[in-house]
Design a protein with these regions (language model features):
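Short, small-residue-biased leader/transition segments that mark boundaries at the very start
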Residues: 2-7
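Flexible loop linkers connecting adjacent transmembrane helices
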Residues: 8-9, 29-56, 82-100, 135, ...
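Extracellular/periplasmic helix-exit of transmembrane alpha-helices
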Residues: 31, 158-172, 233-261, 328-373, ...
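Hydrophobic alpha-helical segments and their helix-loop junctions in multi-pass secondary transporters
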Residues: 71-94, 149-175, 246-247, 336-340, ...
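Membrane-interface loop-to-helix entry segments
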Residues: 74-85, 117-158
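Loop-to-transmembrane helix boundary motifs in multi-pass membrane proteins
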Residues: 115-116, 229-235, 279, 288-291, ...
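Membrane-embedded translocation segments of transport machinery
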Residues: 138, 142-295, 306-324
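C-terminal membrane-solvent junction of multi-pass transporters and transport-like membrane proteins
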Residues: 301-302, 309, 313-326, 413-475
C-alpha cells in the first residue's frame, strides 16, 4: 500500500493488524450476517431489518459509486502499463522509456488517453457483472485469484535475490513507534482507510456477497478467511514494492499513484530486458486485484436495481442496469481523467481541482477584530478578483476579508472522491452498523444467523464488545482524523 510508504514500518502494520482483528473482522461478520439473513442487497436488506435504517443502505450504495469514480481510472492506467510491458517483451514497443517521469506526466495530462483506458476498464467490469455472480464474477475469480498468487510469488522471489532488497524488508518490518507517539491519529486514519478499502467494508459489497452465501456455509469461517487472505496479499505486495525500491532506487520512492506508476516503472527500467517481464507480471497482478475489487463494487450498485425490480414483480434487468450504472459512473470519472491527477488548469490540465470547479477556494474570514499572525488575508475587488494583502497592511474595521481555503482543501479529484467514500462514508457506515447490531438488534441476531448453518458461534463476548464499544468509538476517532486532515 502507498499508505504504508507515508506512515512507515510496523507502526502502520501494527495498527492495521489490530484494526483488522478488532474492527474489520467484526464488521465483515456483521455485513455477511445482514446479507445472508435478508438475502438482499444493502438498501433492501436494511429496509427488511428496520425501515428506520433504509438510509444506511442507500449510503452503502453511494459509497461504491464514489469509489469507482477514481478506481476505474486507476484500473485503466494499470491496464495501459500491463499491456505496455507485454508489447515490450515481444519487441513491439519500447516501454522502458528514457525519461519515465516525463512519460508519466504526459500520460496523466493526456485526457484522451486517460478517458480511453478508463472506458476500456469500465467496459470489462460491466461485461462481467452483467453476466451475474455465478457466470461472471465467480468464474473470473476462480481463474484470477490463483493467477494472482502465482504472479505474486514469482515477482517476490525475483526481487528477494536482488542486492539491497534486505533494506526494503527492514523498512517494512523494522520496529519504529515514532509515528504512534507523534501522530497517532494520522496513522490510525491511514491504516483504517487502507483496511476498509482493502476488505471492501462499509460499502455494501460484503452485504451483497453475503446475500449469495448459502445457509450451510459458516459466516465466521468465511470472514476469517477473507481477512487473513487479504492481509496476506497486501503484505506480499509490500514485499515486492519496498524491497524493489531499495534494491534499485536506494529506498527513494514516490507515494500514491506515483509509487505505482512512476517509482515501479523506474525499478523495472533498471532491470533491463527482464524488467519487461517483471513489469508485465507486476501490473498484471495489480490489474487482477483491481478488477476483482471494482467488479464487487459495481455489483453492489447493479444488485440494488435488480432487487428493486424483483420486489416490484418486474424482470431483474441485470444486463441493462450493469451497463447503465457503468455509463453513469464513467461520466463522473471524467474529472479524475482530466485534472492531471492534481495538476489542475494552472498545470495545463483540462479541468481544475475540486476547489476550483466547486468554488471552494474562498471563504469569509468571519467576524475578526485583528489579523491572525501567519494567516494570509484577501480582499475581493469589484471585478470579483481576490487580492492578497501585504504583510504590513493595516486592519480596517468593517472590511470583509477572505481566506484562501484551497490552501487546505487542495486535493485532486481522486482525493476528493476518496475523502467522501473511504474517509467519511466507509467508517460512518461501519460505525452505525456496529452500533445497531450492538445496541438495537443485539448480538443475538448475529449469533442466530451464524448458527443457522449448524456451526457454533465462537467469541460471543469478543464480538459483542466490538459491536458495542470498540468499532463505534474507534470509527469516531477515524472520522475525526479523516475530516481534520483533509480540511487542514
Amino acid at each position: 500500500s502507498a499508505a504504508s510508504d507515508v506512515y512507515k514500518r510496523q507502526a502502520f502494520l501494527l495498527v492495521y493488524l489490530v484494526l483488522a482483528v478488532l474492527v474489520g473482522l467484526a464488521v465483515m461478520v456483521g455485513e455477511f450476517t445482514i446479507g445472508r439473513k435478508t438475502g438482499m442487497s444493502p438498501v433492501a436488506a436494511y429496509r427488511k431489518l428496520s425501515k428506520k435504517f433504509t438510509w444506511l443502505g442507500y449510503m452503502a450504495v453511494i459509497c461504491p459509486f464514489l469509489v469507482l469514480c477514481f478506481y476505474f481510472v486507476l484500473g485503466g492506467m494499470v491496464m495501459r502499463y500491463a499491456l505496455g510491458y507485454l508489447t515490450a517483451i515481444f519487441g513491439w514497443d519500447t516501454w522502458n522509456v528514457a525519461n519515465i517521469a516525463d512519460y508519466f506526466g504526459s500520460f496523466i495530462m493526456n485526457g484522451g488517453q486517460m478517458i480511453l483506458w478508463t472506458a476500456i476498464f469500465i467496459a470489462l467490469n460491466a461485461l462481467v457483472v452483467a453476466a451475474g455472480v455465478a457466470e461472471g464474477i465467480e468464474k473470473f475469480c476462480k481463474i484470477g485469484m490463483p493467477a494472482l498468487f502465482i504472479m505474486l510469488l514469482i515477482v517476490i522471489v525475483y526481487v528477494a535475490v536482488q542486492p539491497g532488497a534486505m533494506g526494503g524488508y527492514k523498512f517494512m518490518f523494522g520496529w519504529n513507534v515514532e509515528p504512534l507517539t507523534e501522530d497517532f491519529l494520522k496513522v490510525l486514519k491511514t491504516a483504517a482507510g487502507q483496511m476498509f478499502f482493502s476488505l471492501s467494508l462499509g460499502m455494501g459489497a460484503m452485504i451483497t456477497y453475503g446475500s449469495y452465501l448459502q445457509k450451510k456455509e459458516s459466516v465466521q469461517k468465511n470472514a476469517v478467511i477473507v481477512v487473513i487472505c487479504d492481509t496476506l496479499v497486501a503484505i506480499m505486495a509490500g514485499m515486492i514494492v519496498m524491497p524493489a525500491c531499495y534494491a534499485f532506487l536506494g529506498g527513494e520512492t514516490s507515494s500514491g499513484p506515483g509509487l505505482l506508476f512512476l517509482s515501479m516503472q523506474i525499478v523495472f527500467e533498471k532491470m533491463g530486458y527482464v524488467g519487461n517481464i517483471m513489469g508485465f507480471l507486476f501490473y498484471s497482478l495489480v490489474f487482477i486485484a483491481a478488477i476483482s475489487s471494482s467488479m464487487s463494487l459495481l455489483e453492489v450498485i447493479t444488485s440494488f436495481k435488480v432487487d428493486q425490480n424483483v420486489a416490484e414483480g418486474k424482470a431483474p434487468g441485470r444486463k441493462k442496469y450493469a451497463i447503465l450504472a457503468a455509463c453513469i459512473i464513467f461520466v463522473f470519472c471524467l474529472p479524475t481523467c482530466l485534472d492531471g491527477l492534481g495538476a489542475g488548469t494552472n498545470g495545463g490540465a483540462t479541468i481544475g481541482n475540486p476547489a476550483d470547479v466547486l468554488g471552494m477556494h474562498w471563504a469569509e474570514a468571519g467576524d475578526i477584530s485583528e489579523f491572525a499572525e501567519g494567516t494570509d488575508y484577501y480582499v475581493k475587488g469589484d471585478d470579483g478578483i481576490y487580492t492578497k494583502l501585504a504583510a504590513d497592511e493595516a486592519f480596517v474595521e468593517g472590511e470583509t476579508y477572505y481566506l484562501n481555503t484551497a490552501k487546505t482543501w487542495n486535493g485532486d479529484w481522486l482525493d476528493f472522491y476518496d475523502m467522501l467514500s473511504e474517509g467519511i462514508l466507509m467508517p460512518l457506515g461501519a460505525m452505525i452498523m456496529a452500533f445497531a447490531i450492538g445496541w438495537i438488534w443485539k448480538i443475538d441476531m448475529v449469533v442466530e444467523e451464524c448458527e443457522a448453518s449448524g456451526h457454533k458461534f465462537w467469541g460471543r463476548v469478543f464480538f459483542n464488545i466490538c459491536y458495542k464499544f470498540i468499532t463505534p468509538i474507534g470509527m469516531a476517532f477515524v472520522l475525526y482524523a479523516q475530516v481534520t486532515d483533509y480540511f487542514g
